[in-house]
Amino acid sequence: MFTGIIEKMGTVVEKSPNRITIETEWKDLKVGESISVNGVCLTVAQSENFRPLGRFTADLSPETLSSTTLDSLKVGNRLNLERALKLGERLGGHFLSGHVDDVGKVRAIVREERGKIFEITTSPEILKYIVPKGSIGVDGISLTVVRVINGIGFSVSIIPHTEKVTTFGFLKVNDSVNIEVDMLAKYVENLINKKKEKSGITREFLLEKGFL
């Protein structure tokens, strides 16, 4: 489990069809540890301590390669990194599992006085989980949705600090990003669907009774 608060940025130093090696400031990573890499939960398969930096290697499954942006990474690319949440630590963002729901694309970048607005397109299937002022994970970063662009995607506001300490500082129009919707939205939908099956409650019934 992760929080979407990026701890470090890493750099791709080796890439094969099913493995990736990342250079990072962390030199105490343990084999078997979970790391969020651009929002994708990977398991440390090998850890090496170099000076002044460390490296870790993770395996990339066919599912990961087909459903995330990691397949397109190249040596030299920068990455958002976060270690798994420990009990007792502060939750500064929102819960993220590291399981990507969709790959979106940067549609537009609009400069504002105090930062930038990024418009991101996504598949219509996940838009039902995205609401204004709700939480969303983009490349592993916990962000707040500014608005939903009906049928197309959503926008987020990026302050200068976030741009400086994450890969948002490198993103350009048409770049792809990993998207994870708020897991609570999916749990609520699942709960409602189960209740509908048991109770016979439908959208039409709720409209008739004034609940919607």
Feature roles, as predicted:
Residues M1-L212:
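Conserved loop->alpha-helix
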